[in-house]
Curated annotation (Swiss-Prot):
Residues with N6-(pyridoxal phosphate)lysine modification: K278
Record's protein name: Ethanolamine-phosphate phospho-lyase
Subunit field text: Homotetramer.
Cofactor section: pyridoxal 5'-phosphate
Bias (Basic and acidic residues): 468-479
Entry EC no(s): 4.2.3.2
Function per UniProt: Catalyzes the pyridoxal-phosphate-dependent breakdown of phosphoethanolamine, converting it to ammonia, inorganic phosphate and acetaldehyde.
Keywords of the record: Lyase, Mitochondrion, Pyridoxal phosphate
GO biological process, one term: cellular response to glucocorticoid stimulus
UniProt-annotated location(s): Mitochondrion
Short name of any one Pfam family annotated for the protein: Aminotran_3
GO CC, any one term: membrane
């Protein structure tokens, strides 16, 4: 493949012309990706990387069915949605068929951020209320209206929480306020929302909506306890608000057993508004808000027309329809269940073996590995997590870390991920954890390595990295980027680009 620029020149041009707040993976040595296919990505040297984090290329990178559908429609027509066209109504019909009956009205947008912004508008118009309840560590998009309700973002900056925003504790039963040993963590976390509603009402405020990802992604791959959402919905509805389920990162069969993540909590839980995005177009910008007729009619009654220039255009809908076809025809939802179960079992064995692994949580191909320094205190192993993802990159496996402490390895690969891919990923992780734990002086079970000299070399390198970091001159800039371990998680690691 002919490239316009060398990697060095590409980096230079990026620094010159792209805003510095636009980050890339692996800051100290970014990968230049030139092509991709299925669950694999290739750099400018032809090196193949196993993609374990790209939940945008849902049915696989550059799937020929998606490419063909886009090309065919682009050759015929692509215009705005003010004209009648079959694609938009067919796509709306197909999407609605995957959802509970009451969710039947669609608004197409171009991104998850646009979808969540519109969801807030729908919720506020419905009853005329303004306040929003969100979860701690939540992220719902990059628009100003969404940064305001995303503690993941506004708590990191200088922004002050707006008075109409109320933050409820994340229903995290591993690291949160109410843990796995609590008698009824679902009720306890839901009661926190109930108290927020009561306090808001006592202050003369009214709740428009509660918004949450069906499984919190950026917050650390958190799966709420069973019954939590039902109780929250009851309290929110009682306050005249609506429940918004953000499925932007977790929908379209990723959990395996169900097409939508919110469905795994039971048939007695149905959100009032569902937003979706990322995987819808397999990389093509398409997103959607689906809601009830009642909420849609209230929005229309405002007299303000809703129009989105590109939302629901013929090409985007053709791509979206192709993605739905591929999920069904290739049984990718079933694959997510089978491979996800297999991967989870492999990781549970690693948890029993490695002291750094505190928790394995997930369902289908949505999995988090919570790394800790101390199992009793559950101290986040932030530096170790960053070290691991860089070492995995050297092994040609792409992982990333997230959560409030950046210590949770997140796994959200394309849905065509195989058992062979899962085993390869876990084998590399096992070797890296073994070397790292030995370098740290923590106990790990004995591991038979296929390449003892290589293991010895890695162990020496890990020792050197740890030594170098612990003896860094205090006068040096502690936030400089480095391709390895660090001792100051609030300086170096916080400066590292989000991966």
């Amino acid at each position: 493949m002919c490239e316009l620029y060398s990697k060095r020149d590409t980096l230079g041009l990026r620094k010159k012309h792209i805003g510095p707040s636009c980050k890339v993976f692996f800051a100290s040595d970014p990968i230049k990706i030139v092509r991709a296919q299925r669950q694999y990505m290739f750099d400018e040297n032809g090196e193949q990387y196993l993609d374990c984090i790209n939940n945008v290329a849902h049915v696989g990178h550059c799937h020929p069915g998606v490419v063909k559908a886009a090309l065919k429609q682009m050759e015929l027509l692509n215009t705005n949605s003010r004209f009648l066209h079959d694609n938009i109504v067919e796509y709306a019909k197909r999407l609605s068929a995957t959802l509970p009956e009451k969710l039947s009205v669609c608004y197409f947008t171009n991104s998850g951020s646009e979808a969540n912004d519109l969801a807030l508008r729908l919720a506020r118009q419905f009853r005329g209320h303004q306040d929003v309840i969100t979860l701690d560590h939540a992220y719902h998009g990059h628009l100003s209206s969404l940064i305001e309700i995303s503690p993941y973002k506004f708590q990191k900056g200088k922004d002050v929480k707006k008075e109409f925003v109320h933050v409820a504790p994340t229903p995290d039963t591993y690291r949160g306020k109410y843990r796995e040993d609590h008698a009824d963590s679902a009720s306890a976390y839901a009661d926190e929302v109930k108290k927020i509603i009561e306090d808001a009402h006592n202050s003369g405020r009214k709740i428009a909506a509660f918004i949450a990802e069906s499984m919190q992604s950026c917050g650390g791959q958190i799966i709420p306890p069973a019954g939590y959402f039902q109780k929250v919905a009851e309290y929110v509805h009682g306050a005249g608000g609506v429940f918004i389920a953000d499925e932007v990162q977790v929908g379209f069969g990723r959990v395996g057993k169900h097409f939508w993540s919110f469905q795994m909590y039971g048939e007695d839980f149905v959100p009032d508004i569902v937003t979706m995005g990322k995987p819808m177009g397999n990389g093509h910008p398409v997103a959607c808000v689906v809601t009830t007729k009642e909420i849609a009619e209230a929005f229309s009654s405002s007299g303000m027309e809703y129009f989105n220039t590109y939302g629901g255009n013929p090409v985007s809908c053709a791509v979206g329809l192709a993605v739905l076809d591929i999920i069904e025809n290739e049984d990718l939802q079933g694959n997510a269940k089978r491979v996800g179960n297999y991967l989870t079992e492999l990781l549970k064995k690693q948890k029993a073996k490695h002291t750094l692994i505190g928790d394995i949580r997930g369902i289908g191909l949505f999995i988090g590995i919570d790394l800790v320094k101390d199992h009793l205190k559950r101290t986040p192993a932030t530096a170790e997590a960053q070290h691991i993802i860089y070492k995995m990159k050297e092994k040609r496996v792409l992982l990333s870390a997230d959560g409030p402490h950046r210590n949770v390895l997140k796994i959200k690969p394309p849905m065509c991920f195989t058992e062979e891919d899962a085993k390869f990923m876990v084998d590399q992780l096992d070797r890296i954890l073994t070397v790292l734990e030995e370098a740290m002086g923590t106990k790990t079970e004995s591991v038979t390595s296929e390449n003892t000299p290589c293991k010895t070399k890695m162990l020496k390198e890990a020792h050197i990295e740890l030594l170098r970091d612990s003896t860094t001159d205090s006068k040096e800039n502690p936030s400089r980027k480095r391709n390895g371990m660090c001792t100051d998680t609030h300086s170096l690691l916080s400066k590292r680009l989000k991966t």
